[in-house]
């Protein structure tokens, strides 16, 4: 039954914005002149279990981690990109991005259900790097329930951004063949 109370947003306070400068950020690739809310980069763990958003863990404090564990707020959807800490720092343009992966260990040890995502960038986190990441992520089974591997989306509005190449049909076939080896 409706309590008759309405909140302006589901968080009841301010959304947390992203402090990364990812080389693949889709918001940086949007055309100018759209509504302001489309340009907001969220990285808020509360939106992960409430709305299914993916978070990088770089904006998450120890207090946030402990709260997720204490209240069993799950699933948490994590945008991994890679399990190579140095490469993750490069891809997210955040020197703390590699250390943020340690939070996954805390979630695993507490039995928190997780889902993962890897935004695949050609020549950066594909090939052997992707193989390594998937192998590392299997260590979090059964609490890491899924890992989505999605090719980077590229728009025509990339001037001044990190140079990324689109995947060709042949590239995609190779990636899929490698991923299929890991599927159960």
Give the residues covered by each predicted segment.
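Conserved Radical SAM active-site core
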Residues: 2-143, 153-181
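Positively charged, polyanion-binding regions of nucleic-acid-associated proteins
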Residues: 150
